[in-house]
Amino acid sequence: MHKLNVLAALKWYGVALLVILLDQITKNVASHMLVLHQPEPITSFFNFTLRHNFGAAFSMFHDAGGWQRWFLALLAAGVSVLLIFWIAKLPKQKWMEALALALVLGGALGNLYDRMLLGYVVDFIVVHYKEHEWPAFNIADSAICIGAALLVWDSLFGTKVAKYGDAK
């Protein structure tokens, strides 16, 4: 088992902070420049549409009556604490895993900030094809998805680290 190495993890916490900042800046701009539920076309398949998501990813639980705010906030906070420790325990060779976890951490904290401050998460990016529309999302959601994809990629193709930290 690896010891906590908070100093080595600082760069990954910096990545998470960058995600939070980009997420909050873009949400702030969207909230001030867009009208709620009114699409602003960018391309034939992409637009910005301000939405307030009271639920989870892809608007799950959006009409659950209010309990979901606290449940999802507690879940995000718990996962974030776990990720902070996980990142600090990773050996230096596991940089892709650390990057992936930092992206997930930044995304989780970006959405947690919204949920605690506003009671909902600001979404504004919409991809669509004809009448079919993907649920609205934001930079935090994108970071979480990219981080999850990197975790899968790393688990399948990444550098394996032996018990004592030697790369195989």
Curated annotation (Swiss-Prot):
<keyword id="KW-0064">Aspartyl protease</keyword>
<feature type="transmembrane region" description="Helical">
    <location>
        <begin position="70"/>
        <end position="90"/>
    </location>
</feature>
<dbReference type="GO" id="GO:0006508">
    <property type="term" value="P:proteolysis"/>
</dbReference>
<keyword id="KW-0378">Hydrolase</keyword>
<comment type="pathway">
    <text>Protein modification; lipoprotein biosynthesis (signal peptide cleavage).</text>
</comment>
<dbReference type="InterPro" id="IPR001872">
    <property type="entry name" value="Peptidase_A8"/>
</dbReference>
<feature type="transmembrane region" description="Helical">
    <location>
        <begin position="139"/>
        <end position="159"/>
    </location>
</feature>
<feature type="transmembrane region" description="Helical">
    <location>
        <begin position="6"/>
        <end position="26"/>
    </location>
</feature>
<keyword id="KW-0645">Protease</keyword>
<keyword id="KW-1133">Transmembrane helix</keyword>
<dbReference type="GO" id="GO:0004190">
    <property type="term" value="F:aspartic-type endopeptidase activity"/>
</dbReference>
<dbReference type="GO" id="GO:0005886">
    <property type="term" value="C:plasma membrane"/>
</dbReference>
<comment type="function">
    <text>This protein specifically catalyzes the removal of signal peptides from prolipoproteins.</text>
</comment>
<keyword id="KW-0812">Transmembrane</keyword>
<comment type="similarity">
    <text>Belongs to the peptidase A8 family.</text>
</comment>
<feature type="active site">
    <location>
        <position position="123"/>
    </location>
</feature>
<keyword id="KW-1003">Cell membrane</keyword>
<protein>
    <recommendedName>
        <fullName>Lipoprotein signal peptidase</fullName>
        <ecNumber>3.4.23.36</ecNumber>
    </recommendedName>
</protein>
<keyword id="KW-0472">Membrane</keyword>
<dbReference type="Pfam" id="PF01252">
    <property type="entry name" value="Peptidase_A8"/>
</dbReference>
<keyword id="KW-0997">Cell inner membrane</keyword>
<feature type="transmembrane region" description="Helical">
    <location>
        <begin position="98"/>
        <end position="118"/>
    </location>
</feature>
<feature type="active site">
    <location>
        <position position="141"/>
    </location>
</feature>
